[in-house]
Amino acid sequence: MSDISKKSNNGILFALGGGIVLSMNDLAIKALSGSGYALHQVILLRAFIGIAIVLGVIWASGGGFRQLLTKRPLDHLFRVSIVMCSNITYFVGLSLMPLADAVATSFVAPLFVTLMSAVILGEHVGPRRWAAVAVGMLGVVVMTRPGAGVIQPAAILVLISAFCYASSHMMTRRMGLTESAMTLNFFVQVGFIVVSIGFGLVAGDGHLAQAPGSTWEFLFRPWHTPPMADWWAFIATGVAVGVGGLMMSQAYRTTQAALIAPFEYIGMPMAIFWGALVFGTFPDGTAWVGIALICGAGLYTLWRETVRKKKDLDVAAPSGDI
């Protein structure tokens, strides 16, 4: 196996693993949103756990904390701002929508990633991969059923989140030449901590609390001390964002963004699984059609990429220039 093929396969595995782990984050925050907690409190506790994991991995790897030093502070500030916007809009939308609906709506992000990777990064995206992404997005449309009233303020927030999420991955790809996955993840967690503490100082006493059921209720709730029974969810969010974030950053910094993006569709079946197991919700027939289109598109993209690589190697092999 060539170095390029090995790197691509590793990137795909990181993306799949990161998507599965990050699905636990959606599950836990969805549960916490129904338990009276404020979003900025959840993000703060999650970030403390996540940054502890990142620092622990750095210490265990023996690479030293010098790898957290950066010559690109402004790029990190811009990327952290985008990630923060993506998180806030997504989780506010998630608090108001069924888990599977929110995740399905968020899957416009891979389409944005593919578009940006071609236009901004200049990566080659063949017509078959474009077609596969289009089929996947058709599945998202089937899942969200806009004619049935799914397109609402909460769904618009998730769409905004998807655009910001795709933009953050373009930044990850550009910064990956000089910044490690550890560094990228560390500065995101620091940003979460700073913004959440600031937000808590302004709104944590509840004087900006919104009416129950309003769009911004989750964001402006007052802080309160979690009982032991709820700590599993806070720990799950921290572990998910720490481990899953590292895996996803590693995938995007080492592999073409257009190849990685379809494998984030693993979050869809995971959302179905968690929704059925924890919240007692299960997809109907229409939803299953959407899932088939989405997953089928991702698998087809993997197959097309494998065929393309084999052809490239067959052409290059006679000259030894691989």
Give the role of each language-model region:
Residues 103-108, 176-191, 242-276:
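Helix-helix packing/entry segments at the starts of transmembrane helices
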Residues 35-85, 163-171, 188-204:
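Transmembrane alpha-helices of multi-pass small-molecule transport proteins
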Residues 32, 42, 93, 99, ...:
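Hydrophobic/aromatic residues within transmembrane alpha-helices
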Residues 30, 54, 150-213, 220, ...:
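Transmembrane alpha-helical segments that form core, pore/gating elements
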Residues 128-145, 161, 286-305:
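Hydrophobic transmembrane alpha-helices of multi-pass small-molecule transport proteins
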Residues 11-16, 64-89, 153-159, 210-243, ...:
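Loop-to-transmembrane-helix transition segments
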Residues 269-322:
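C-terminal-most transmembrane helix of multi-pass membrane proteins
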Residues 109-131, 269-287:
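C-terminal transmembrane-helix exit sites in multi-pass transporters
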